[in-house]
Amino acid sequence: MSTYNPLDPSALAELKQIVGEKYVWTDREKLEPYSHDEVTGEKYVHYPEAVVLPANAAEVAEILKLANRRLIPVVPRGAGSGYACASVAYQGGFVLSTERMNQVLEIDEVNMVMVVEPGVRTADVHKLALEKGYLYPGEPSSSDSSFI
């Protein structure tokens, strides 16, 4: 069984160097929405030690290197619109939120490919596909609130 380490002050400082101080949250009020997904009930609520909001893949890579080196659990999170409690920090550690990574990087109409960052709303992908005359079939009922 793996042993995880808590998020100590020096690791927090490193995270702030990677993404900037304003994108590492530790205030309980800011952590609350990240302590659960759409499943309700006190037994499903687990506060992360922090929420980290990277802006790009390079920052994600540096964050994951740090977490791996220090054995700190990382919980990747989209919009938190699921019902499986998969974005909840049950083992402690921090939530890595993709909400700042919300850009459409490319629409290749010849090959019918859209490249998006993980924080793009599903409804936006669907809308862009329709505007180009295509259909994005993965349209969940939570498309207005879920990330791709």
Protein language model features and the residues they cover:
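Phosphate/diphosphate-binding loops
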Residues: 123, 127-129
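Short beta-strands and strand-coil junctions in structured, solvent-facing domains, enriched
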Residues: 61, 122-123
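Conserved PLP cofactor-binding pocket of PLP-dependent enzymes
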Residues: 77
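Extended, alpha-helix-rich binding/interface surfaces that flank or overlap catalytic cores
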Residues: 119
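N-terminal flexible segment immediately upstream of the FAD-binding catalytic core
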Residues: 1-65, 69, 81-112, 141-148
